[in-house]
């Protein structure tokens, strides 16, 4: 029978000093036999997705204590990728994921916590905490801050739904007036919460539902809606039950590695492909699987991508659809429900809240339940009032969206496309693979060939695009922006947004060993592995080389002979795999430490002490 980890610091004469310190935090004699639950919060005033979390940790703590546990809260860092975008701040985004995972490990192991509730939300925070939960393998429940309401603005007599990406694209479009840009800017991000489309943050919070580590509605219930409070309240009670099940009943189904098994990772990736999630999720899912010692690789993702259809398109793939619309259509449980009907899910995986995922779907899918409570829950609507306050409104849609032929969520028989929303491409340009969000690619450019325009930094590409030096038909190649080469694997949202603002969104391709924001759409291919800094072929591309992209056949090729590539490789080996241009980039000791152990994206950009 497992023993509560916390007994290490709460029992025995030799722990008198530790108990004295625990007492100084407010613990009493009656608390020393209870499970100590870490409330892992990520409140910060820097990030709209986290600005409302300050009091939510204590909300969970009170519920833990009411359920018979002891709650101890601490905070992690949280980087806002949108604010860090387009300058050296983005170098810190992906490395912050490892720092978050490490900090959770440090705090939980140093203080011998028995279990934890992870209050996450934005891009690297959910992945970092997910990695920590699988690394530590103690009972864990995830509850995120929730998505932002979509912006609404009336311009020239027409109402538009907006998000962050709209503001960025408008700012670079010379045809849009300063007044209209300002109007869009002021309306794009109206409330607290993670950005309103199917960007990285919301994608990851949705995937925790499929993994079985969070409650139904975690990925889609708006941050501002009163219904979201229930998730925090239930998480507090649930984690105490999970802790008791494991430590007092030896029930390993309460542990993250049992719940988030390989089959559960297949479910999560199936969902990701079906909903056209951010390509960053591939990076984070691979990293989380690595932490859980689960054999889940790019090959598994490739296999799934070939049989899972695209059942939902949300901004940026469909600019007028946001997370509030997904929720109205039944949220993640209803997407999983459609996948289940198509025989594409592992139903028997356990979850933190139900015996199996199949049981959860049967209860929470709006097309198969008669529960008015469930149906009311998914009618939660935006309040339409700018606010930074959680649970501040309780608006409801009059009706649910249950149209599975033409609605926000489609059935397997009526998909947006038979091919899923993500694809793995391989070829001599990316021997270990690269990723494209096919849900955001226009059908006219699923096959594309063009001459390479080579840039050795994101900044150089942006300068060329804005100067109209990139033309229709070009393939923009941005290299030395991978985990090691960047370092930090910057997001390329500005280059893709500027291509769109220049009218080239359907006329150019972009390939990089960096990554893309969840807000990216177009023929944007990232995670090219190996990256240039690790000797990848992307480092051998020269200006004007022809590149062939074939998404239906999952290939990406540099039209250069093997003999020529071998000669170029020998030349590059002699020079060293570094950018030829001097980049004005402040790479600090902290970033150098990350780069020293970073692997390429096909391994999730995790650290490997054997990397040289």
From Swiss-Prot:
It catalyses: (2R)-2,3-dihydroxy-3-methylbutanoate = 3-methyl-2-oxobutanoate + H2O; (2R,3R)-2,3-dihydroxy-3-methylpentanoate = (S)-3-methyl-2-oxopentanoate + H2O. Gene3D superfamilies: IlvD/EDD C-terminal domain-like. It comes from the Bacteria. One of its GO terms (molecular function) is dihydroxy-acid dehydratase activity. GO terms for biological process: isoleucine biosynthetic process; L-valine biosynthetic process. Its EC number is 4.2.1.9. InterPro entries: Dihydro-acid_dehy_C (IPR042096), DihydroxyA_deHydtase (IPR004404), DiOHA_6PGluconate_deHydtase_CS (IPR020558), ILV_EDD_C (IPR056740), ILV_EDD_N (IPR000581), IlvD/EDD_N (IPR037237). The active site is at residue 517. The keyword Oxidoreductase does not apply. PROSITE patterns: ILVD_EDD_1, ILVD_EDD_2. Disulfide bonds: none annotated. [2Fe-2S] cluster binds at residues 122, 195. Its cofactor is [2Fe-2S] cluster; Mg(2+). Homodimer. This is Dihydroxy-acid dehydratase.
């Amino acid at each position: 029978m497992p023993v509560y980890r916390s007994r290490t610091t709460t029992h025995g004469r030799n722990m008198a000093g530790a108990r004295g310190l625990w007492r100084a935090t407010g613990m009493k004699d009656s608390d020393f036999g209870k499970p100590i639950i870490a409330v892992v919060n990520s409140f910060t005033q820097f990030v709209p997705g986290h600005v409302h979390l300050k009091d939510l940790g204590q909300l969970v703590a009170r519920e833990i204590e009411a359920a018979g546990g002891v709650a101890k809260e601490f905070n992690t860092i949280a980087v806002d990728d949108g604010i860090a975008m387009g300058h050296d701040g983005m170098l810190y985004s992906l490395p912050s994921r490892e720092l978050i995972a490490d900090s959770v490990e440090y705090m939980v192991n140093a203080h011998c916590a028995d279990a934890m509730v992870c209050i996450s939300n934005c891009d690297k925070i959910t992945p970092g905490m997910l990695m920590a939960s699988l690394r530590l393998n103690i009972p864990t429940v995830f509850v995120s801050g929730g998505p932002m309401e979509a912006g609404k603005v009336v311009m020239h007599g027409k109402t538009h739904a907006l998000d962050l990406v709209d503001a960025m694209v408008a700012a670079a479009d010379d045809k849009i007036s300063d007044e209209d840009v300002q109007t869009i800017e002021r309306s794009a991000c109206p409330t607290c919460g993670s950005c309103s489309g199917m960007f990285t943050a919301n994608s990851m919070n949705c995937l925790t539902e499929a993994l079985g580590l969070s409650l139904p509605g975690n990925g889609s219930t708006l941050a501002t809606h009163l219904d979201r409070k229930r998730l925090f309240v239930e998480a507090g009670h649930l984690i105490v039950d999970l802790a008791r099940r494991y430590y007092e009943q030896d029930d390993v189904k309460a542990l993250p590695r049992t719940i988030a098994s390989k089959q559960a990772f297949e479910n999560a990736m199936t969902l990701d492909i079906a909903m056209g999630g951010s390509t960053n999720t591939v990076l984070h899912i691979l990293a989380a699987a690595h932490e859980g010692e689960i054999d889940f690789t790019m090959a598994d993702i490739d296999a799934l991508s070939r049989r899972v259809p695209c059942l939902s398109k949300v901004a940026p793939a469909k600019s007028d659809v946001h997370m509030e619309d997904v929720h109205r259509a039944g949220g993640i449980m209803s997407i999983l429900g459609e996948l289940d009907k198509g025989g594409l899910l592992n139903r028997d995986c356990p979850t933190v809240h139900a015996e199996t995922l199949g049981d959860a779907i049967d209860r929470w899918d709006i097309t198969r339940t008669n529960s008015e409570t469930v149906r009311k829950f998914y009618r939660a609507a935006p309040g339409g009032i700018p606010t930074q306050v959680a649970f501040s409104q309780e608006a409801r849609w009059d009706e649910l969206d249950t149209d599975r032929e033409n609605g926000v969520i489609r059935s397997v028989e009526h998909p947006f496309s038979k091919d899923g929303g993500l694809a793995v491409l391989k070829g001599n340009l990316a021997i270990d693979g690269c990723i494209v969000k096919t849900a955001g690619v226009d059908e006219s450019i699923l096959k594309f060939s063009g001459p390479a325009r080579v840039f050795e930094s994101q900044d150089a590409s942006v300068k060329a695009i804005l100067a109209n030096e990139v033309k229709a038909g070009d393939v923009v190649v941005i290299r030395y922006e991978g985990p090691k080469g960047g370092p930090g694997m910057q997001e390329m949202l500005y280059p893709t947004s500027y291509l769109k603002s220049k009218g080239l969104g359907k006329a150019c391709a972009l390939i990089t060993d960096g990554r893309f924001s969840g807000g990216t759409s177009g023929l944007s291919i990232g995670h090219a592995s190996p990256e240039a800094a690790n000797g990848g072929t992307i480092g051998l591309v020269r200006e004007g080389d022809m590149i062939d992209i074939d998404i239906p056949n999952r290939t990406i090729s540099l039209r250069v002979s093997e003999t020529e590539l071998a000669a170029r490789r020998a030349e590059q080996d002699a020079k060293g795999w570094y950018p030829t241009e001097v980049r004005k980039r402040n790479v600090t000791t902290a970033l150098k430490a990350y780069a020293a152990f970073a692997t390429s994206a096909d391994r999730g950009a995790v650290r490997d002490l054997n990397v040289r």
